[in-house]
Amino acid sequence: MPRTRADVARTDKLDEIVEAARGRLVDGGYGALSVADIARQLGVAQNAIYWYFPTKDHLLVAAVERILHDILDCKPKRGAAVDRVLWFAERLHEFQDLRLTIRERARSSEVVAAFERNVVGLLRLLLVNSLSEVATPDHIDDAADAVMALCEGVLLRDISAVHRRRLLRFGIERLLGPDSTV
């Protein structure tokens, strides 16, 4: 029988659960996110997980949120706009399967749908900030949307990293002009 963990602080329990879920998502995708397996891994009852996360979708959101925070902690602060956008696109590529899972789960889960809307808004804000030096204020929104569409389109193709970067660089430079490489 799983042990009780009354001596462990709530925040520590939450952190353990989210970290275990994060590890499963990174290693095996959504299919590996099993509440029962996480409970066994942590030595707790399955209901203990549901005490903190009412549904598997709530746990998915918390784990993906952790992954995004890890990524954003490493984002470049300086550099040419095109290089920052390429960095952004490569991070999106690394988690393409999770992004597609989020999009799919959003169709049937309001908690995931709300999370997806927030993530898209955050990613768009990051792009706007990255492009602010090379796009005029009256074109920044369209530039961000065009670059986002370019990134998403290229990421859907099954091509090498070198080819992906070349296509993205080509598209970004055409969209934003020569100042984007400065």
Cite the ranges covered by each PLM segment:
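N-terminal intrinsically disordered/low-complexity leader segments
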Residues: 1-12, 181-182
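Helix-turn-helix
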Residues: 16, 20-58, 62
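Solvent-exposed, amphipathic alpha-helical segments
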Residues: 20-28, 70-77, 102, 146-157
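Short helix-capping/turn signature of helix-turn-helix
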Residues: 53, 102-109
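Amphipathic alpha-helical linker/stalk segments
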Residues: 63-86
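Amphipathic alpha-helical packing segments from all-alpha helical-bundle domains
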Residues: 83, 91-94, 110-145, 166-173
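Short, hydrophobic secondary-structure boundary micro-motifs
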Residues: 98-104, 114-115
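Amphipathic C-terminal alpha-helical segment
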Residues: 129, 147-165, 174-182
